[in-house]
Amino acid sequence: MAYLIFSLSLLLIYLGLALALHVQFGMLGIANFGVVGFWGFGMYMMGIFQAELNMSFVDALFIVLVLSVAVSALMGWLVVRLDPQATLCTTIAFGAIIALLVVTEKWITMGVVGLGTIRYPFRIGGATEYIYFFFLVGIVVGMQVLVLRLHKSPTGKLLQAVRDNEELCASLGKNTFQIKMFWFVLTSVVMCLLGALSAPLNQFLTPNMIVPSVTFAVWIALVLGGKEHALGAMVGVFVTFGFFDILIETYAPVSPELAVVVPNMKLFIYGLALMAVLVFRPTGFLAPTTPPERVWGEMRKVAATAGSGGLALAKAGKDRLEATVFMPAKTTPKKSSEAGADEEAKE
């Protein structure tokens, strides 16, 4: 039962990471492949403050919050203006740098030896793990509710508009850099805090926890569930981590000979499922909550009446819309008959 609670708690952490990535990529269009970097940074900072400096959970969490804002703001300043390919390389490099620092900076991270033991914040006899589990449930449920409300709010529509056509939003007076910067920093800080909450769950931290497979697992879950749907992250995490890591690997009646093959088979099935979804259902198991036409409907109305006759033409594609803004000619040439009449009047 204790291992089940641990597995479900870890599932909640992955669900929180997927929700944060959903806002970053699904709503805003920033491809963050450094999820494990933010998560690992928060986890190791919490471990250092609690295990090495003997701080309380609340004090350590507050300092992790401050440091996370600084690191996320630095990364946001670097990646927000970049194109998708450069963003991909930069965020992957960030995750690799965090993993390298954990190994090399032995004076504070203990290197490959590991760091621990990290205490649970709530210690009430044998119910400590259960209380922490329900604590995580409350946090992740709150995140899911906020994401659902964000999708229905004007802010959510604005994020989707920036994702689909940043140039058009900028032409309408929206500060797209500020919008992307704020939401990237906010969601990255959430990833760091989820890492901090993972530290008491693992209790003993080692560098082999900060591996790219964490990022790929979150991405696969989001793509399978539906990157643009408010519930896509939840569905994807339950299908991948919940089904394979909890039900199959833990409770399926597998012989000892096949138990070694199950983890590799899991990755193989992940790959097949991902290819099938990308080919037959690119939007994931769930369709987008808000059709692009509905998002751009209001934008077209605003563009059509914006300053000195500006006109916006939106063309609906399968997954996104491309918009073109042009200015009408300043003068309209007169017809030949009208021009001749004017000349005769002057004479």
Kindly give the residue locations of the regions a language model identified.
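Transmembrane alpha-helices and adjacent helix-loop boundaries
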Residues: 1-347
